[in-house]
Amino acid sequence: MKIFREVFELGNKEIILETGGMARQADGSVTVSCGNNVVLVTTVVKKSVADGTDFFPLSVHYLEKTYAAGKIPGGFLRREGRPSEEQILISRLIDRSIRPSFPDGFFNEIQIVATVLSYDGAFSPDILALIGASASLAISGAPYDDVVAGVRVGYTNGKYILNPNKQDLRDSDLDLVVSGTYDAILMVESEANSLPESVMLGGILYAHKHLKTIINSINRLAKVASKPRIEYSIYQINKFLKSQIKSQFFGEIKNTYTIALKQERNLKLNAIRKNVLEYIFSSDVDGNEYTEKEILEAFHDIEKDLVRSNILEGKPRIDGRCTETIRPINVKIGVLPGVHGSALFTRGETQALVVTTLGSDRDAQLVESLDGIEKCRYMLHYNFPPYSVGECGMVGMAPKRREIGHANLAKRATQAVFPNEEAYPYVVRVVSEILESNGSSSMATVCGSSLSMMDAGVPIAEPVAGIAMGLIKDGAKYAVLSDILGDEDHLGDMDFKVAGTRYGVTALQMDIKIKGISREILEQALEQARVGRLHILGIMNEVIKEHKEAVSDVAPQIHVMNINPAKIKDVVGRGGATVKGIVEKTGAQIDTSDSGEVKVFAKDKKSMDMAVAMIEEIVAEVEEGQVYKGKIVKLLDSGVFVNLLGSQDGYLPFSEIEQAGMKTNSLVEGQGLEVLVQNIDRGGRVKLSLVAR
């Protein structure tokens, strides 16, 4: 058993790549170590293409084992279940990073599994998994010539931080992951605190500069440990078939791509496809028998060439816009009467209905990870039903990876403006229902989420808007597109989503289908996105530009009280009897903490006010010189104890009672008396006198 090892430094941390010791029956197997973090990444490549496959079946699975952190899983079975959303997001991040590096037309199945074996809690293992995926591919024999690497970058006090740990990220204004090849950037994922475009671009370029160290190390490992290149074929469009279809139908196709409405355009294209199939099947084109799949792929290639060439030649886009024009936008808020906050955001043929719901601490999501259980106060969910694109399909199933990814992007885009718990004690759930989709539904979700939260009275720091940018590139010629359609995303070379406030960027997500893009294109895309974002924010601000001062009449009420910590036991009562009594009488939820914080959460203002008043009565402090109406709670030989407020009693001597002209032998427990607080000693003992009638 021969083991090969490569060591390099990343942000003053030593990273070790090792192969030959584990999972040797996989085509590629690499362990990546940094400190006490160890990730095993395996690659298996099928040696032939499955029948009927017309796409690249790459799958990436990132898995965290609880034993890696010295823990036993919860639940009845005490074993790991389905991957968490965070694991799915990391799987997507790796997939998006490496997918562009494979040759077009390569359809062999590849499965990559990254397993976290050891975890020290200081660094997230996601970058190690990404590096390991690239390294295991590089030695697997797959056609993976443009080796990819990825790094994370933070930004604190005006300086970029390479490979920041979790504490660094808590203090950072930026969480940026960049992956790419030696010469080009392929993928960007980031969350930021409204940073200028120049800082975002600088972070991307800073990250790319440091990718080269990792790529060199992977290449050295591959040089000594790589398996022989597998034999594979590349699927190619039949050029003669394509020319025959083009000669007969190009005029119709060209005219159809001037129809702005998607549904109308698709109906016409489907009719042309039907005619194309009939033409090819009924005529002896070149003596070959073509399958329906081959014919439709040739047809699709003609569509792709047409749309791309039109844009590069400066002609109008599919819906008649120029490269920088944004589709018509319509904004409505308060569209649903029975919810806490709602917005309907429509941009062209993309429409998102976004609803905000307010809840208490008990509604917070508990997220279990290797770091333990974390309470999530802000949830954002994205639903993409089949009717949004005019199709039939599965409804009511668990969210797909794409839905999870889009929700995460929208949440990251709005996280920077979301209030902290001290400023806003509510738990917030935002749900985006995509009612129509023709591109940029995730960015419509960003805009709708901002609007919906403001409608619900959530005090977000600034409105947030998002825009999706596209790219058409052929050699040195290129065009950057603002607010792309679904077809432009599908037929183009880039999907670059940018979200932010009027002050700067809060989130970026970029995916590339070609071999990378230049600094010049990045700069233009960011500037064009900034102009577009400000345009969208201007339209949103005409409807609502800051949060409503009060929550909806149908929204729950919440009140936070800070009392003397010593009084918490009085609010709770023996065995919880006091607080249970308040809950039963008012219907409110009451949460207490040892710090003295009391949260009252009620379905309406009346219930909340009643609960708050009862708690205030319990915790109120008696004051010297004040008169109180109390009740006798205990008779002694020399006087009586009178309950004044809550659990606070005072001592009333018989001498004071007699001085006021009242007989002491007539006193009974439960009798009401009006008393004056004479003094309170250092021990908190209260001395009373009787108020004369």
Curated annotation (Swiss-Prot):
GO MF annotations in UniProt: 3'-5'-RNA exonuclease activity; magnesium ion binding; polyribonucleotide nucleotidyltransferase activity; RNA binding
Keywords: Cytoplasm, Magnesium, Metal-binding, Nucleotidyltransferase, RNA-binding, Transferase
Catalytic activity line of the entry: RNA(n+1) + phosphate = RNA(n) + a ribonucleoside 5'-diphosphate
Cofactor dependence: Mg(2+)
Function, as annotated: Involved in mRNA degradation. Catalyzes the phosphorolysis of single-stranded polyribonucleotides processively in the 3'- to 5'-direction.
Assembly behavior: Component of the RNA degradosome, which is a multiprotein complex involved in RNA processing and mRNA degradation.
Protein name: Polyribonucleotide nucleotidyltransferase
Lineage summary: Bacteria, Pseudomonadati, Pseudomonadota, Gammaproteobacteria, Thiotrichales
Gene: pnp
